[in-house]
Swiss-Prot record:
Family of the protein in this entry: Belongs to the dCTP deaminase family.
HAMAP family: dCTP_deaminase
Keyword field: Hydrolase, Nucleotide metabolism, Nucleotide-binding
Residues the entry annotates as binding dCTP: 111-116, 135-137, 156, 170, 180
EC number(s) recorded for this UniProt protein: 3.5.4.13
Subunit architecture: Homotrimer.
Protein's name in the database: dCTP deaminase
GO terms for biological process, alphabetical: dUMP biosynthetic process; dUTP biosynthetic process; nucleobase-containing small molecule interconversion
Function: Catalyzes the deamination of dCTP to dUTP.
Gene3D superfamilies named in the record: 2.70.40.10
Amino acid sequence: MSIKSDKWIRRMAAEYGMIEPFEPGQVKQKDGHSIVSYGTSSYGYDIRCSDEFKLFTNLNSTIVDPKRFDSNSFVDLKNDICIIPPNSFALARTVEYFRIPRNVLTICLGKSTYARCGIIVNVTPFEPEWEGYVTLEFSNTTPLPAKIYANEGVAQVIFFEADEVCETSYKDRKGKYQFQQGVTLPKI
């Protein structure tokens, strides 16, 4: 299994539609202002979050149960920024839509710009033949409110090409998060 380079990422985006919209270079400025970078890096792709957020709230004072998750635990927000309360979290989705080839698995890691501020980005692997917008999880580990910027970089996707094609892909298993379009809550 090998990590794939910028050349491979560009080729797969062009020929396979692996990432849409796709940025072949690194974008570090917008309208003359510095932003958290996004686009193709040496051995990965820096993804952006859209302006669609689900902000966790404890207004209903419920127990967080992944098997019976209460959607009323979130407040929907559409904005250029999302302020996450102390020790809380928010969900968002990527700007980019992904189509993962059958012989590829990805790992996604948060950008250091956010990590150095106590904001942790968690994303599970994109499995072979998974397709959709990625749901992003942001945890504010600080005792202060934390800001997330829409349409800027939040995490890096690293692509691994397998030595052998898997017998059963995410698509074959009819994975429950296949073709997700928006911010997707837990499913069982």
